[in-house]
Amino acid sequence: PVFDHRKAHTAIFYSISNTQRGLRGVSFGSFLLKRVIDDLKRDFPKLDQFATLSPMPTLATWVGKNPQLLAELGIELAPDELASGTWANDAKQARRLRDPLRQLAANYLASAKQSNGHTAMPFDPVSRFHLGNGARVESLNFMADTSAKGFRQSYGLMVNYLYELDEIETNLEAFASTGSIAMSATLRRLARKK
């Protein structure tokens, strides 16, 4: 069946990237996203939710620097075994890994930082982009990218960033001034869980 696009209420952005090396560090994303959202709202007035389906390209790199985190979460596989994705072929093992991997990713998004000289910024470049444009880390998707690259980078996990229109400016200001990460209550609880 064909979906009546006039009834659409959610727009999902997939694979937003800042590809030009010379533009790294230049925040054109906020302007671009706001313009696209305005255009979409004009063309599809019922749209009221704007989110992304985004990769976490440096999750496995971070775990490689902190391998003890796997044992702390009860994950018995080594980082390279997780990155191979072979475990996903065993449905029972995949079910066992679902919650610990989601918790690992929530911890990563909430607390993995790198210093830029002034403030500690998220280790993940995609997270820096979306948080720097006022998004909120909303949810995690297990087995969302089962490509070899998806397993190699993030064990098959992907993340949704939500652009809540009435929160964008507040989130952006808090992130820019203090490095505060806007995150859904569900993910924040998951990140704190021990």
Give the label of every model feature segment.
Residues 1-194:
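Extended, composition-driven regions rather than compact fold-specific motifs
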